[in-house]
Amino acid sequence: MVVDGDTIKIDSVKIRFSGIDAPESYYKGKEQFCFKGEEKISCGKLSKIFLIEKIGNEKVKCEIEAKTDRYKRKLGECFVKDKSLSRILVKNGYAFDYPRYSKKKYSIEQEYAKKNSLGLWSMKFEFPWDFRKNN
């Protein structure tokens, strides 16, 4: 089950994709929005929908790290058909390389999305970490 753009739930265990950050669907009662021209769009929902579509009915396999995040979620990288969901999200512009934690692991995918104005890079947005800091 997809919780949001960077978190899934498998057998009641929440797994946060480490090293990336997706827009917030709901954070402290607030939704994160992006703007395409005058149109106001829920960028958190866009990321979640993209992830749902990428997983489809396929089996998800995750490599779980030993540590958890501050919300007690497991951290890891998850795959569909041996393809990293984190890399897919970042390369298509629906999540961001989170340099604070990733050591720029996804920077090539992010540059590709940015250069090609894919996903959120085609809109005005606030990075999720800035949105949380400001709210």
Label each residue range with its predicted role:
Residues 1-135:
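Small beta-barrel nucleic-acid-binding modules, primarily SNase/OB-fold domains
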